[in-house]
Amino acid sequence: MIIVTNTAKITKGNGHKLIERFNKVGKVETMPGFLGLEVLLTQNTVDYDEVTISTRWNAKEDFQGWTKSAAFKDAHSHQGGMPEYILDNKIAYYDVKVVRMPMAAAQ
């Protein structure tokens, strides 16, 4: 399993604009190997908002299949370029080495 994060630096007070874009079912949910998505808002930033989109995939090839799909291109086609509220972004890839799940409570 891999996790891919896209961390965006957003003009202060506008993080909700990016978050709202992910608060609906999209086409990524239908992609082979897609395991889930979380949208994270960093707490206590002073000068800007920071939003991280974290996606989980069975394999890097599955993520690459998403980025090459027509659905990805459609979802990321910004008329006139990147939205003005996004100041910067960084993509990172993580190999998941350990996963721990909650244990059932003792009866």
Swiss-Prot record:
S-S bonds: none
Listed PROSITE patterns: ABM
UniProt site positions, description: Transition state stabilizer: 66
Main EC class the enzyme belongs to: oxidoreductase
Keyword DNA-binding found: no
Native source species: Bacillus cereus (strain ATCC 14579 / DSM 31 / CCUG 7414 / JCM 2152 / NBRC 15305 / NCIMB 9373 / NCTC 2599 / NRRL B-3711)
Protein name, entry field: Heme-degrading monooxygenase
The reaction(s) this protein catalyses: heme b + 3 reduced [NADPH--hemoprotein reductase] + 3 O2 = biliverdin IXalpha + CO + Fe(2+) + 3 oxidized [NADPH--hemoprotein reductase] + 3 H2O + H(+)
HAMAP family membership: Heme_degrading_monooxygenase (MF_01272)
Residues in ABM domain copies: 2-94
Function: Allows bacterial pathogens to use the host heme as an iron source. Catalyzes the oxidative degradation of the heme macrocyclic porphyrin ring to the biliverdin in the presence of a suitable electron donor such as ascorbate or NADPH--cytochrome P450 reductase, with subsequent release of free iron.
GO MF annotation list: heme binding; heme oxygenase (decyclizing) activity; iron ion binding
Subunit text: Homodimer.
GO BP of this protein: heme catabolic process; iron import into cell
Family: Belongs to the antibiotic biosynthesis monooxygenase family. Heme-degrading monooxygenase IsdG subfamily.
UniProt binding sites for heme: 76
SUPFAM superfamilies to which the protein is assigned, alphabetical: Dimeric alpha+beta barrel
Pfam families according to UniProt: ABM (PF03992)
InterPro entries in the cross-refs: ABM_dom (IPR007138), Dimeric_a/b-barrel (IPR011008), Heme-degrading_MO (IPR050404), IsdG (IPR023953)
Coiled coil location: none
Enzyme Commission number, as recorded: 1.14.14.18
